Amino acid sequence: MIFPNIDPVVHIGPWALQFGPLALRWYALAYVAGILLGWRYALRLTRTASVWGARTPTATALQIDDLVLWITLGIIVGGRLGYFVFYMLMNDDQRAWLAAHPMDVFKIWEGGMSFHGGFLGVCAAIILFARQQKIDMLRLGDLIAPVAPIGIFFGRIANFINGELWGRVTDGPFGIIFCNETIQANHPQRICPAGPLPRHPSQLYEAALEGLVLFLILAFAIYRLKWLRRRGALVATFLLGYGLARLALENVRNPDVGMPEFPLGLTMGMMLSIPMILAGGWLLWKSLKEPIRDDAEAHEPA
C-alpha cells in the first residue's frame, strides 16, 4: 500500500493556508481538536451527577474553562522541552545542528514534540492549578486523565498524515510505503526518509491503542466502576494503560535515528514509559485498598 499523497498544510480548495513560514497544519488542527473535544468531555463529566454519587464534582465548569489554558501551555511548553531534553540533546547530529542554529529550538511549527514531555507539562499545570484553586490535585488528575486519550488519538492521526514516526519494515498485509511526492517535496534532500519498503503504520496502531482503546477503558471505569469516586484510580489506569500500550508498540515503531544504544535493547520511549507503568501500578494498588467514600467529603469547588 502506498502512503496517500496528503499535504501536511491544510488547504481550502486549491489554496494553502500558509503565510510565509507559518502555516495551518493538520498537526496543529489535531492539537486544537484534542483540546476542544477534551474540554467538552470534561465539562460533561462535571455535569453527570451519576458518576459522582453524593460527592461534589471536583471542579466547576468555570474552573474547567480556566484549566484549559493551563493545560494547553503545559502541552506546548512541556512537549517542546521534552523533545529538546529527551531527544535533541541525546542525538549527536541534532546537538550539532542546535549549536549552529540555537533559535531552532523555538520553531515549534517545524515539528518536534514529545508526548512524555507534554505529559509532564500537563502534570505541572494540574499541580499548580490545584494549589491555586485549593483542589485535591489527584482528584483533579482523575477528572483530566479520561480526557487525555482524545488528544493522543488526534495527535497520532496527525503523525500519520505527516508521514512521520513510521514503524519498522514489514511484509504483513498492513504495510505502507511511506513515500510520495509530498514527503519528497518537504524533505531538504528531496528524499523519502522511510525508504521504499513497506512499514508498519505504527501511528495508527498508537491512535487505536493509546487513543481509542484507552478512552473506552477509562470510560468503562467512570460509568460502570464509578471510579471518579475512587481517588487516584483513573490517573493510575491512564498511567498503566498508556505505559503498557507504548511499551508494546515500541517494538513495531522504527527506532529514533541517531539515538544512543540503551541497555537491554530499550528505546527512549520504553525508558520513559516504564516509570509510568510502575507509578500507575503502585497508585492503582493504593487506590483499590481504600474504600469508595460516597459522600460529600471531598471539597467544595471554589
Curated annotation (Swiss-Prot):
The keyword Transcription regulation does not apply. Keywords: Cell inner membrane, Cell membrane, Membrane, Transferase, Transmembrane, Transmembrane helix. Its EC number is 2.5.1.145. It is found in: Cell inner membrane. GO terms for molecular function: phosphatidylglycerol-prolipoprotein diacylglyceryl transferase activity. InterPro entries: Lgt. It is a multi-pass membrane protein. Catalyzes the transfer of the diacylglyceryl group from phosphatidylglycerol to the sulfhydryl group of the N-terminal cysteine of a prolipoprotein, the first step in the formation of mature lipoproteins. Pathway: Protein modification; lipoprotein biosynthesis (diacylglyceryl transfer). GO terms for biological process: lipoprotein biosynthetic process. It comes from the Bacteria. Belongs to the Lgt family. A 1,2-diacyl-sn-glycero-3-phospho-(1'-sn-glycerol) binds at residue 156. This is Phosphatidylglycerol--prolipoprotein diacylglyceryl transferase. Its main location: membrane. The lineage of its organism: Bacteria, Pseudomonadati, Pseudomonadota, Alphaproteobacteria, Caulobacterales. It comes from Caulobacter vibrioides (strain NA1000 / CB15N). One of its GO terms (cellular component) is plasma membrane.
